[in-house]
From Swiss-Prot:
This is TATA box-binding protein-associated factor RNA polymerase I subunit B. Although it shares weak sequence similarity with GTF2B/TFIIB, displays a similar subdomain organization as GTF2B/TFIIB, with a N-terminal zinc finger, a connecting region (composed of B-reader and B-linker regions), followed by 2 cyclin folds. Residues 114-351 are annotated as: N-terminal cyclin fold. Residues 229-253 are annotated as: Disordered. The lineage of its organism: Eukaryota, Metazoa, Ecdysozoa, Nematoda, Chromadorea. It is found in: Nucleus, Nucleolus. Component of RNA polymerase I core factor complex that acts as a GTF2B/TFIIB-like factor and plays a key role in multiple steps during transcription initiation such as pre-initiation complex (PIC) assembly and postpolymerase recruitment events in polymerase I (Pol I) transcription. Binds rDNA promoters and plays a role in Pol I recruitment. Residues 35-101 are annotated as: B-reader. A zinc finger (RRN7-type) spans 1-33. Residues 102-113 are annotated as: B-linker. Residues 230-243 have a biased composition (Acidic residues). One of its GO terms (biological process) is RNA polymerase I preinitiation complex assembly. GO terms for cellular component: RNA polymerase I core factor complex; RNA polymerase transcription factor SL1 complex.
């Protein structure tokens, strides 16, 4: 019989077949051609023989009907439906590639959600630290040991949080504490194909082995196909052999524990689409790592701590913040985004990252950054490693940057010798992390309580819904409006500027004196000329057009635009209704130089309308540009005038140009300064305006500056005292109307130089002023605190519906202390004499009449209940702020 196409005997390879009873047999060996349709129909597809096992004959083409049906259905679809499906696939692809929520596209599908991009955050933060250390050493000419010190400080931070470089990072042989990663097996399809091929080859080998031992081998050879369609299921070979090459690279991976001398093998198990990896990493360490704070505020704290550990006494925290904003470290926008948590975490109710997510670009005033740095310093206990800051060195640096006379510096040092100042960067006198949560405790806290724990890191906690402004735990956490605590910490930078500001008021009559004409004495210091120079140099530092600044009459508008409701208020529409929300942290702060971070050196595309361009980058690496940027502006202006002389030839005012480059360091503050120094040591002769010194307006009462020590039950326990945002706002708001234009300009300018909010600088100024003007009162308060004697403070209890009643409180320390630095908690108790004094007061009747006039329908029982319900307690400003001045200065 002539062979048909593709017909070949698979036993002997012959091409000639004979038809016998409807079946084809090979003419050479007699093997049946592999077509079992009639055999399947007649005998049911199963042939039983006596041998080693059962012989199963497979069906071919069983799914042809289904395939034909599917093809018929697909051909019946219209072209519109086919195009719609193709368009949906294409739109899904582009939607997956699009950036959402200002985040980069990362493979979230293949990364477990519980990892929180941990590897990306740690790697990005470490790379930024390494780059910062390289720039400090190679470009800013710091010592080479700064780089390893920065990395060692970060290592200590990880060890403190029990994340890495510690024994708790490993779990040993306890499998319950191991971290088990459940991941998607991306190579499942490929492994499945390889497994099918392996089983197919194994069946062939088993079939050959069965044929060699079977008694009915001839029957099998003549009636079955032993290469593909023969499937033997023997009792001896029920268990499948595992692939020895599968996951060979993971089986030999071991981890050594140096302390316990235990060897922990990493188990990698793959079951279908799921890949289960049992690691030697502790689950607790991973949980702490994903909750630890990694942002630019911690970066500032690490850099400042490393520089002070290397012995640099003249570097302030404001300098490090300014270097980051000036793009000296070339931190890219991508690195900042990698340090942040992903958008998926922000959508969950247990998001612990709103503290970092609210402001990632360091747009904070200095006191906000100081708070995080203080938390870092006190948590790691770096006091032994850090060098002590020298007030004289720092004051000389600031006076040189401001181009002030040397005699002015001597007056600043004289004032500091009379009123000592604590310039320790740990700020133990203002805040103590032992009263709340440190970095290690924040990393170990539950996600639901993380935000409230961060708010109470120094023991402060908002008490009521309205006072907290959606800043409480549990229910309020779901709203995700938490920003931060309302505590203001006075940094050493702010205290130094407060001394300079007070010396100006004590030496010059900046409030009442008129603008004096130019003095003929070339060696006399003219404060009006110096203020003009300060204003022009600040404009030059802010990148204004100097051809406009140096004109005789040309107003230079401010670049910044104030928000409608204040600097720390946000306005938004909610369902058509306007909402004004007060932020706990002053995010979006722009009263600094530069006002925002610049990414010019790391951006892929140039910014066309960016006014923050870096002029003369080579000169920016000079020591004067790094440490005295305001004084360095004379070099910048001189370079610009040399580059484009035609621009400044006929426009610039000669007097303004002369004032801009004038040197005041050798000028005399007063005409008879040398005579005063030789003949007398009187305070009034050194400070001529001290005898007629006037105090600006101050509020009568201060509130929201106390909190209980108990976090879970805020109605019991002793109190802690602090400076709140509201107290600073009230203090500056009341005094602003009495400011003179000169003092207002000096306050804003000095705060602008260090990147501080003017209200924090004025609060430090008032504290220093109280030490000078109310020294007897503060000394009495100091002795009472050290001896644990009660201090009587006048108060007002504000109740519902504007009820308020005067009362008295006695403030005493919780425990006797030997020095003010050890003072933590206070006991505030009511006095029995309070009601008697109120009864004898001349205003008691008027107050009683006014309170009851508001609610005439109140019964006696209701009035008694209202009197016992106190909403707020305001303290007398002079006494309470005096306690804060003694404790914190």
């Amino acid at each position: 019989m002539a062979p048909e196409t593709n017909e070949k005997c698979k036993a002997c390879g012959g091409f000639n077949f004979s038809m016998i009873d409807g079946f084809k047999y090979c003419d050479r060996c007699g093997t049946l051609l592999e077509n079992f349709e009639e055999l399947e129909a007649e005998e049911g597809g199963i042939q039983q023989t006596r041998g080693a096992g059962k012989i199963k004959i497979k069906k071919k083409g069983g799914d042809d009907g289904e395939k034909k049906t599917t093809n018929l259905v697909s051909t019946n679809e219209s072209n519109v439906q086919i195009m719609r499906k193709a368009l949906e696939k294409r739109s899904d692809f582009f939607s997956r590639q699009a950036l959402k929520n200002d985040e980069l596209a990362f493979p979230h599908e293949s990364t477990p959600d519980y990892l929180y991009r941990l590897g990306l955050r740690l790697a990005a933060f470490t790379q930024v630290l390494a780059k910062v250390g390289h720039v400090l050493v190679k470009e800013l000419n710091f010592e080479p040991r700064v780089l390893p010190t920065i990395l060692a400080t970060f290592q200590r931070y990880l060890a403190h949080c029990h994340v890495a470089f510690c024994h708790s990072e490993q779990c040993g042989s306890d499998e319950q504490l191991r971290f088990v990663a459940m991941m998607e097996n991306l190579e499942f399809e490929q492994q499945e194909r390889e497994e099918k091929r392996r089983k197919k080859l194994a069946r062939r080998g088993k079939g050959v082995k069965a044929l060699s031992k079977s008694a009915a081998a001839w029957t099998l050879l003549t009636q079955g196909n032993i290469t593909e369609n023969l499937d033997l299921d023997s009792e001896e070979d029920e268990e499948e052999e595992e692939n020895p090459n599968l996951n060979k690279s993971m089986e030999n991976l071991e981890f050594e524990d140096t302390q316990n001398d235990e060897t922990v093998a990493v188990n990698d198990t793959t079951v279908g689409f799921v890949r289960k990896i049992t690691t030697a990493l502790s689950t607790e360490a991973l949980r702490r790592a994903r909750q630890m704070i990694l942002n630019l505020e911690i970066l500032v704290a690490i850099i400042h701590s490393a520089l002070m550990s290397c012995g640099y006494r003249n570097v302030l925290a404001s300098d490090v913040v300014r270097w980051i904003r000036e793009d000296r470290f070339r931190i890219s926008l991508r690195s900042i985004r990698l340090m942040r948590h992903s958008a998926k975490e922000q959508e969950t109710k247990e998001a612990m990252t709103k503290v970092d997510y609210a402001e990632p670009y360091l747009r904070f005033p200095l006191y906000e950054i100081t708070r995080t740095s203080t938390l870092f310093h006190q948590s790691l206990n770096l006091n032994e490693k850090l060098v002590s800051l020298n007030f004289e060195t720092l004051a000389a640096r600031l006076c040189d940057n401001l181009n002030l006379p040397v005699e002015f510096l001597s007056r600043v040092l004289l004032l500091e010798s009379m009123i000592p100042c604590d310039v320790n960067p740990s700020l133990r006198k203002q805040a103590d992390v032992s009263m709340g949560h440190n970095c290690e405790q924040l990393a170990a806290i539950q996600p639901k309580l993380y935000n409230s724990g961060f708010l109470s890191c120094f023991g402060r906690k908002e008490r009521t819904w309205r006072e907290a402004d959606n800043c409480d735990e549990s229910v309020k956490l779901a709203l995700l409006r938490i920003q931060c605590i309302c505590r203001v910490l006075l940094s050493p930078d702010t205290k130094l500027m407060a001394y300079i500001l007070l010396v100006f008021r004590l030496t010059f009559d900046i409030d009442n004196a008129t603008c004096s004409p130019d003095s003929k004495d070339a060696l006399k210091f003219d404060i009006d000329t110096w203020i003009h120079q300060l204003e022009m140099r600040l404009k030059c530092w802010q990148e204004h057009d100097m051809s406009m600044v140096l004109r005789s009459s040309c107003p230079v508008p401010d670049i910044q635009i104030s928000t409608p409701f204040g600097p720390n208020y946000s306005y938004y529409d909610k369902k058509g209704n306007p909402w004004v929300h007060r932020l706990r942290r002053q995010v979006g702060f722009a009263k600094c130089i530069p006002s925002e971070m610049s990414f010019n050196s790391t951006s892929s595309l140039p910014t066309v309308f960016d006014i923050r361009q870096n002029r003369f980058k080579t000169e920016r690496r000079q020591l004067e540009a790094v440490m005295s940027p305001l004084k360095f502006q004379r070099v910048i202006l001189r370079k610009e005038m040399e580059r484009d002389p035609e621009k400044y030839r006929n426009i610039v005012d000669p007097d303004s140009e002369k004032t801009f480059f004038k040197d005041f360091t050798v000028r005399k503050v007063l005409e008879n300064t040398q005579k005063i120094a030789e003949t007398s040591n009187s305070f009034d002769e050194y400070f001529p305006c001290a005898s007629r010194y006037t105090i600006y307006k101050r509020p009568d009462w201060i509130q929201n500056c106390t909190a209980r020590s108990k976090q879970l039950s805020p109605k019991i326990g002793p109190y802690r005292f602090y400076i709140s945002n509201q107290a600073c706002d009230d203090l500056l708001g009341v005094a602003t109307s009495s400011f003179s234009p000169r003092f207002k300009f000096l306050l804003d300018s000095l705060a602008l130089i260090i990147g501080e909010d003017p209200k924090a600088l004025y609060t430090a100024f008032v504290m220093l002023e109280m030490h000078l003007t109310s020294s007897d009162t503060l000394e009495t308060i100091r002795e009472s605190l050290l001896r644990s004697k009660p201090i009587t403070v006048k108060c007002q209890k504000f109740r519902k519906t504007m009820w308020h009643v005067e009362c008295l409180r006695r403030v005493v320390t919780e425990h006797p202390v030997g020095k003010i630095e050890d003072l933590k908690y206070f006991i505030v108790a009511s006095t029995r004499e309070s009601q008697e004094e109120l009864a004898e007061s001349s205003e008691a009747y008027l107050m009683h009449f006014r309170n009851h006039e508001i609610r005439e329908d109140l019964t006696s029982l209701e009035a008694e209940k209202v009197q016992n319900r106190v909403l707020k307690l305001a303290y007398d400003f002079e006494t309470f702020f005096g306690i804060l001045a003694v404790k914190m200065w």
